[in-house]
A protein has these predicted regions:
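Condensing-enzyme catalytic core mediating Claisen C-C bond formation in acyl metabolism
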Residues: 4-8, 31, 35, 230-307, ...
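Conserved beta-ketoacyl condensing-enzyme motif
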Residues: 7, 22, 31-174, 207-216, ...
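A glycine- and small-aliphatic-rich helix-loop capping segment at beta-alpha/alpha-beta transitions
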Residues: 21-28, 113-131, 193-196, 216-229, ...
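Active-site-adjacent elements of ketosynthase-type condensing enzymes
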Residues: 42-55, 115, 209-236, 278-298, ...
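Short, well-ordered amphipathic alpha-helical segments that serve as non-catalytic structural scaffolds
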Residues: 78-89, 159, 258-259, 292-308, ...
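Active-site-proximal alpha-helical scaffold in enzymes
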Residues: 78-91, 156-167, 173-208, 247-268, ...
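Phosphate/pyrophosphate-binding loops at sites that engage ATP/ADP/AMP, CoA/4′-phosphopantetheine
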Residues: 85-98, 263-267, 300-316, 338-342
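Glycine-/small-residue-rich "gating" segment that lines the acyl/pantetheine channel
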Residues: 127-147, 188, 192, 208-265, ...
Length: 406
């Protein structure tokens, strides 16, 4: 018999709140966390707004923030969300569990990015006569101005490694950075690890911020970001005819998942059961979905098949809903291909309309939102939905939360 996996702990750090209750209340109220970028001077960029987390201080969330002082923002967001999730699961204060069977699987963004130091090093190593970078001098500058710990913090594995060390989690430890799918994939792979008996418990989810000059300029070059000229809170408009790109957000979502009998034995509170997972690739283009939605269709259908539930049992779809022309059209097509006529009877919404796109952390935060929607019977809306798109013709819960049993 296949092992059943449940969620026993959850935590978030988002632009709409740094607790689950605060975040969800803001979502169902239709509030926006999007505003002018304050992290750096973005006035010369095509996009000047994002969904930032304001006044974040890790010391407010963990007992001892000193081990994190040299860590990047991705690790610090993850630590705060993980602290909440582990506390929610009753696993702090020397809880008696087998730590060798308790792992970490994240979809977390790149390690620390020391842009100011890097730019100054490039400037000092630039040879004006040859108009080129002196690589030997650049390496020498690195030896002067970097230390070993700072170098290690740039690696992709640092966030799960830090969480394992800080919370003494000695089981399997992985990070996958598969762009927007990262934390969803991490949760699915953590689920599979428990199913296969490699662990009994996993701390899983994601953490990411790309609200920095290279992140904004990079997505601007891809023409992926909204360049809306009005009120920034109106800029992200998933499934609307006039959508023009996504808005960067940042944050972390963390969950504790464990085998059902293990959770029952220790008297854990159970939030929900994870029943289905599937992972596919479009095999089309790195930056675009397949125009016929092949990967999306296969993934949705595969997850439903793996779960053993019927389409009629599904009461809500939390969409990726990025507010780009291609994604929203292809995602709608994928839902209709899998759900058939049922697609028009199943509410769909995108919380990216309010908190932007958390990139690697998006899936984890949106899963937690789904759990809260099921618990409360209230579905968050898709805000800024004004002009219907003939190709996006489902029920997107426009502009106002809805009471609905999901």
């Amino acid at each position: 018999m296949r092992r059943r996996i449940v969620i026993t702990g959850m935590g978030v750090v988002t632009p709409l709140g740094t607790t689950i209750q605060e975040m969800f209340q803001n979502l169902i109220a239709g509030k926006s966390g999007i505003g002018a970028i304050t992290r750096f001077n973005a006035k010369t960029f095509p996009t000047t707004f994002a969904a930032e987390i304001k006044n974040f201080d890790l010391a407010k969330y963990v007992k001892d923030a000193s081990p994190w002082k040299d860590c990047g923002v991705n690790s610090c967001f993850a630590a705060a969300a993980a602290q909440q999730a582990l506390e929610d699961a009753g696993l702090l204060d020397n809880a008696k569990v087998d730590r060798t069977r308790f792992g970490v699987y994240l979809g977390s963004g790149e390690g620390i990015q020391d842009f100011n130091n890097m730019v100054s090093m490039v400037a000092r190593a630039y040879d004006s006569q040859t108009r080129s970078l002196d690589c030997v001098k650049f390496a020498g500058e690195g030896l002067k101005h970097f230390h070993g710990g700072r170098e290690a913090e740039q690696e992709l594995h640092t966030t799960p490694a830090h969480l394992a060390q800080y919370f003494c989690l000695e089981g399997p430890n992985f990070n996958c950075l598969t762009a927007c799918a990262a934390s969803s994939q991490a949760i699915g792979e953590a689920l599979e690890m428990i199913r296969h008996g490699d662990a009994d418990m996993m701390l899983t989810g994601g953490s990411h911020s790309m609200i920095h000059p290279f992140g904004v300029s990079g997505f601007n070059l891809l023409t992926a970001l909204s360049t809306f000229k009005g009120d920034p809170t109106k800029s992200s408009k998933p499934f609307d005819l006039n959508r023009d790109g996504f808005v960067l957000g940042e944050g972390s979502g963390m969950l504790v998942i464990e085998e059902l009998e293990h959770a029952k034995k220790r008297g854990a509170k159970i939030h929900a059961e994870l029943t289905g997972y599937c992972s596919t690739a479009d095999a089309f283009r790195v930056t675009d979905s397949h125009p016929e939605g092949r990967g999306a269709i296969a993934c949705i259908a595969g997850a439903i098949k793996d779960s053993g539930v019927s389409i009629e049992d599904i009461g809500y779809i939390n969409a990726h809903g990025t507010s780009t022309q291609v994604n929203d059209r292809v995602e709608t097509l994928g839902i209709k291909k899998v759900f058939g006529d049922r697609a028009y009877k199943t509410p769909v919404s995108s919380i990216k309309s309010m908190m932007g796109h958390l990139i690697a952390a998006a899936g984890a935060v949106e899963l937690i939102t789904c759990v809260e929607a099921m618990r409360t019977g209230i579905l968050p809306p898709t805000t800024n939905y004004e002009t219907p798109d003939p190709e996006c013709d489902l029920d997107y819960i426009p502009n106002k939360a809805r009471e609905h049993k999901a």
